[in-house]
């Protein structure tokens, strides 16, 4: 851990706990800061706050009292999910208090160089792919950030021989100041989290913060297929490398079903361990990072051919009576479902879809679902998805939940078929999050498998 005197004897307010807030509180305390933690959850139900109090850190729980900011805080470190319209955040900003996120702290103390990955879709899969390839190629890559391992916690023990492979959300990137990765990757940009950012332009700007401090000695990797790329490319000091599944570019690309980097053949696309056009794109982005990091073509190809996916992201669960099950519960929008379907022959696919009704029409999904063997529909959006199925000429059945849908799908399946959970909708009408939805699918698969044995 690098020496950092920035916060020594400075009052710092941590707004919101969760994993990142807890990690930030411990790090700042270690750096000599006078830390106060404020979390909305009651103290009695808040084991993280209880633990921090035992360590001598001041905690204020159960509400967010504005008068707390009457103290002379030098910095606020907020949970990324707390919006900037929050009264505490607004008051801090009005008083001129810098509002940071925990990844900024990670950068300030990290001895390890940082590879930073952001984007609308594919962040977690690509971050995991990159770490796996780097590790197989002889590097020491440490997963961190929005992937479940607080960046500041990982950075505390990372050495200069490690590489922090960091997944970053737009929320986290709004709270950086000096953050400076050596390699940064933007997988793609789609209009998401608009309720938080207010507009697509504001969302893009948040993502673009990733390159704010990069220089010509650093490399920014961009998706050449994105409409915004040409304009954004003119606004960075970083050196540029591109990836594309559709055209030859200065970087990583697909040509005639083969993956290349600057003219060097890496592997066949069909040898990738995970299906779908989106995973070709994820692999190309990974290849760009790997080649820039000095990894051999052999190590890249070996890792990507054996990569089995990430939980809830087109994760292959296995087969029952030669029927394959894929869990893509992270598919919370139409684009994610389209990309999942691109990896399969539709006439063998039984698609489980539906969820929170956000007012979407599913017209854009119609070309992608044509020829499906069957659709099993559930949730608030089922009625609208029925209309899309009818227009695509696809038969459908209804289910009351994912477990019911899994059973119905298996009853419809024949050997060689694929049962794909790729909802194209958020989960919140029926489940707390996509993970719980996906876990129900996994449990249903395991129960069916047990029943067949």
Swiss-Prot record:
Please state the pathway this protein functions in, per its UniProt record. Cell wall biogenesis; peptidoglycan biosynthesis
GO CC field: cytoplasm
Major subcellular location class: cytoplasm
Q: What is its EC number?
A: 6.3.2.9
Q: Where in the cell is it found?
A: Cytoplasm
User: Known Pfam families for this protein?
Assistant: Mur_ligase_C, Mur_ligase_M, MurD-like_N
What terms describe the molecular function in GO for this protein? ATP binding; UDP-N-acetylmuramoylalanine-D-glutamate ligase activity
- GO biological process terms, semicolon-separated: cell division; cell wall organization; peptidoglycan biosynthetic process; regulation of cell shape
This enzyme catalyses:
UDP-N-acetyl-alpha-D-muramoyl-L-alanine + D-glutamate + ATP = UDP-N-acetyl-alpha-D-muramoyl-L-alanyl-D-glutamate + ADP + phosphate + H(+)
Which UniProt keywords are present, listed alphabetically? ATP-binding, Cell cycle, Cell division, Cell shape, Cell wall biogenesis/degradation, Cytoplasm, Ligase, Nucleotide-binding, Peptidoglycan synthesis
Q: Does the keyword Cell cycle apply?
A: yes
Is the Lipid biosynthesis keyword given for this protein? no
Binding-site residues, ATP:
119-125
| Function (record text) | Cell wall formation. Catalyzes the addition of glutamate to the nucleotide precursor UDP-N-acetylmuramoyl-L-alanine (UMA).
Report the sequence similarity comment from the record: Belongs to the MurCDEF family.
Name of protein: UDP-N-acetylmuramoylalanine--D-glutamate ligase
Species name: Streptococcus uberis (strain ATCC BAA-854 / 0140J)
The lineage is:
Bacteria, Bacillati, Bacillota, Bacilli, Lactobacillales
């Amino acid at each position: 851990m690098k020496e950092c005197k920035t916060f020594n004897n400075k009052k710092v307010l941590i707004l919101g706990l969760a994993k990142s807030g807890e990690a930030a509180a411990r790090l700042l305390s270690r750096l000599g800061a006078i830390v106060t933690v404020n979390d909305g959850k009651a103290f009695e139900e808040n084991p993280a706050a209880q633990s921090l109090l035992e360590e001598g850190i001041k905690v204020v729980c159960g509400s967010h009292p504005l008068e707390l900011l009457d103290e002379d805080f030098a910095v606020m470190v907020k949970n990324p999910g707390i919006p900037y319209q929050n009264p505490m955040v607004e008051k801090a900003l009005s008083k001129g208090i810098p509002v940071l996120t925990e990844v900024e702290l990670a950068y300030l103390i990290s001895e390890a160089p940082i590879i930073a990955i952001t984007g609308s879709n594919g962040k977690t899969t690509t971050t995991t792919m990159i770490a796996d390839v780097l590790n197989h190629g002889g590097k020491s890559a440490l997963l961190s950030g929005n992937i479940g391992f607080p960046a500041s916690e990982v950075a505390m023990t990372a050495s200069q021989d490690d590489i922090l492979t960091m997944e970053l959300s737009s929320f986290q990137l709004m709270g950086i100041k000096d953050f400076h990765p050596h390699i940064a990757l933007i997988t793609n940009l789609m209009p998401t989290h608009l309720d938080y950012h207010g507009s697509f332009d504001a969302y893009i700007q948040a993502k673009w913060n990733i390159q704010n401090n990069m220089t010509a000695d650093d490399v920014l990797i961009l998706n050449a297929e994105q409409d915004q790329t040409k304009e954004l490319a003119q606004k960075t000091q970083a050196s540029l490398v591109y990836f594309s599944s559709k055209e030859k570019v200065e970087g990583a690309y697909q040509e005639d079903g083969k993956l290349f980097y600057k003219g060097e053949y890496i592997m066949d696309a069909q040898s990738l361990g995970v299906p779908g056009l989106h995973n070709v794109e994820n692999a190309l982005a990974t290849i760009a990072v790997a080649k820039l990091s000095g990894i051999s073509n052999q190590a890249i190809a070996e890792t990507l051919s054996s990569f089995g996916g990430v939980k809830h992201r087109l994760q292959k669960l296995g087969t029952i009576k030669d029927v394959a099950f894929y869990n893509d519960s992270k598919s919370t929008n139409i684009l994610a479902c389209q990309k999942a379907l691109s990896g399969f022959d539709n006439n063998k696919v039984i698609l489980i879809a539906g969820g929170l009704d956000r007012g979407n029409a599913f017209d854009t999904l119609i070309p992608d679902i044509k020829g499906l063997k069957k659709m099993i529909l559930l949730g608030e959006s089922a009625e609208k998805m029925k209309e899309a199925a009818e227009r695509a000429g696809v038969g459908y059945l209804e289910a009351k939940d994912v477990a019911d849908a899994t059973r119905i799908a298996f009853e419809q399946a024949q050997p060689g078929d694929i049962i794909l959970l790729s909802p194209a909708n958020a989960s919140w009408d029926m489940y707390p999050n996509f993970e719980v939805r996906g876990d129900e699918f996994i449990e249903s698969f395991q129960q069916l498998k047990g029943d067949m044995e």
